[in-house]
């Protein structure tokens, strides 16, 4: 924006694939559907996708606060892992996956989700919970995935504590 042209291309990612992709728009309820949406995006040339794996339950209902504002059950974690594994398979080892949480989980659930998904080589974990400097630092100390935020942090003064405590790796 200031200082002249720096690059001729920028990278874009396919976003919110939990709602399907292209002609396959609709709620992804099963891991196979998540994988198919990622594969469609990959075929269109995207090498990075962003998902909220905690949007739609297998029965089609939307998840709500009571589903992710608590310690998550082993069955829930297996479901999140199965969905992530399907997307990882579709994207291949070199494709990037961004996990989106819309700041909904509490800290316990955010940590559980992050730890369960670490093995899938997640590019970054966006808004794992409602951001506060201390809570974001706490989550960053328990999850080995770069954390991102920005939809709820908007000024340089609001970002300062996150830079000072080194809890965010990506700002948006």
Which residue ranges define each predicted feature?
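Glycine-enriched alpha-helix->loop->beta-strand junction motifs that scaffold or abut catalytic
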Residues: 45, 115-123, 140-148, 163-171
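Phenylalanine-focused residue identity feature
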Residues: 6, 53-54, 138, 163
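Catalytic cores of alpha/beta
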Residues: 107-115, 154-166
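Metal- or metallocofactor-binding catalytic centers and their adjacent structured scaffolds
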Residues: 1
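Thr-Gly-centered strand-to-loop micro-motif
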Residues: 126-127, 149-151
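Residue-level detector of flexible, active-site-proximal loop/helix-junction positions
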Residues: 5, 19, 154
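Short beta-strand/loop segments at the ligand-binding rim of alpha/beta enzyme cores
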Residues: 5-12, 90-100, 140-150
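Metal-dependent enolase-superfamily TIM-barrel catalytic cores that perform enediolate-based chemistry
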Residues: 14-133, 137
